[in-house]
Amino acid sequence: MSKALNFLAGVVILAILLAQAQTTEATQAGASKPAANTNGFVVDLQKHWTTAQGLAVAVAEAMPAADYSFKPVPEEMSFGEQIMHIAEANYGYCAFLTDAKSPFVDLAKDAKIEKAEAVKQLTGSFEYCSAAFSKVTEAELDAVHGTGDHKFVARDVMLGVMIHMVHHRGQAEVYLRLKGIKPPDYKW
């Protein structure tokens, strides 16, 4: 299974590199450039976060409740653990962003993860982050959060939560495929 996951990751990276090469080639060939973005980083991130929420929740809902304990190999998290991990990390990153304590409560720790609870936690974590993002102004993007060795600017925290979530959602999509379930289609 690990080889299949590594192969899939390699295919995704290759596709990204090919797309970047085509974009560079088109730009060098004199293709028209898109209009300058005047929305600002926070507005743009919020738009993509909303899309990501829909995709992540759709992935969580696609797996039958009976398969939430499915693990492709023993050393991996179960599907339910992946979903709860996304929720916990979302809460953690966004609490860090607002200098607050994470409201995440791991009700499933050392217990069977129920689908309904996992989807509820996941949805709540996206809403929590959306509210946290809306409190950050463009002027505050370079504000430092954290203490000691754990200091990050707001922009890094916001990008970090997105990257972390996408990484684990991608893993969850592979779990769906391994169970013979087509993951939800990507929506822009």
Regions found by a protein language model. Give the residues of each.
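Sec-dependent signal peptide cleavage junction
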Residues: Q20-K33
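Short, contiguous alpha-helical
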Residues: Q46-T50, G54-V57, D67-L107, G146-W188
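Acidic/histidine-rich alpha-helical segments that form the ligand environment
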Residues: V59, A111-G146, V153-V166
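Bacterial N-terminal signal peptides
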Residues: N6-Q20
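Short, low-complexity N-terminal intrinsically disordered segments enriched in polar/charged residues
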Residues: A31-Q46
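Positively charged n-region of N-terminal signal peptides that target proteins for export
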Residues: M1-L5
